[in-house]
Amino acid sequence: MGLLEVAAGPNRMVTFDGRVLEVFGGSVRRFHVKLLSVTVSGPDKHGNRNVVLHQAGIENSLPVNEPTYERLQSLLEALKSAGVPVVG
């Protein structure tokens, strides 16, 4: 797998190389696939969702609108393929 890069909002970029997920924008956060799980909330009344990255008892939340959520689909599928539990 090559490097996957997805814009997750106007000031946020998410990259995944098959082993490490990195979130850029503000502070940089890194997640290893062996320690990561992901939950995705259902859409609220405005179509917004919350993608939550869980690692070692810490949660990092990525609030996204519907177009951004659609862009994240390839990333969520790649995470699932790497063995990351993705719920929602």
Identify the residue ranges that each predicted region occupies:
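Acidic, Ser/Thr- and proline-rich intrinsically disordered linker/docking segments
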Residues: 1-3, 9, 24, 29-88
